[in-house]
C-alpha cells in the first residue's frame, strides 16, 4: 500500500513545475524596456541631422542676386 501512496505523490509533484513558467512572463517585459529605448534614440537622431545640412545650402543661393544687377544695365 505504501508503494501506491508514493506513486500518487509522484504525479502530484509535477504541478510545482507550473510556477516556473510564470517567472518568464514578468522577465520578458523587463528585458524589452531596456533594449527598446536605446535603439529608438539612435534612429530619430540621424533624421534630424540632415535638415540642418539643407539650411547650409541655402546661403550659397544668395550669390545669384549680384548677377541680376548686371542684367538690368544690359537691358538699358
From Swiss-Prot:
InterPro entries: SPRR2. It comes from the Eukaryota. Keywords: Cytoplasm, Keratinization, Repeat. One of its GO terms (cellular component) is nucleus. The keyword Cell cycle does not apply. Sequence repeats lie at residues 21-29, 30-38, 39-47. Residues 21-47 are annotated as: 3 X 9 AA approximate tandem repeats. Residues 53-76 are annotated as: Disordered. It is found in: Cytoplasm. Expressed in uterus. GO terms for biological process: epidermis development; keratinization; keratinocyte differentiation; response to estradiol. The keyword Chloroplast does not apply. Induction: Up-regulated by estrogen in the uterus of ovariectomized animals, with strongly increased expression detected in luminal epithelial and stromal cells at 6 and 12 hours after hormone injection. Cross-linked envelope protein of keratinocytes. It is a keratinocyte protein that first appears in the cell cytosol, but ultimately becomes cross-linked to membrane proteins by transglutaminase. All that results in the formation of an insoluble envelope beneath the plasma membrane. Belongs to the cornifin (SPRR) family. This is Small proline-rich protein 2F. The gene is Sprr2f.
Amino acid at each position: 500500500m505504501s508503494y501506491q501512496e508514493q506513486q500518487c505523490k509522484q504525479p502530484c509533484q509535477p504541478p510545482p513545475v507550473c510556477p516556473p513558467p510564470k517567472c518568464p512572463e514578468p522577465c520578458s517585459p523587463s528585458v524589452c524596456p531596456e533594449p527598446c529605448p536605446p535603439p529608438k534614440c539612435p534612429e530619430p537622431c540621424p533624421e534630424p541631422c540632415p535638415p540642418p545640412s539643407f539650411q547650409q545650402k541655402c546661403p550659397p543661393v544668395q550669390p545669384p542676386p549680384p548677377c541680376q544687377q548686371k542684367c538690368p544695365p544690359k537691358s538699358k
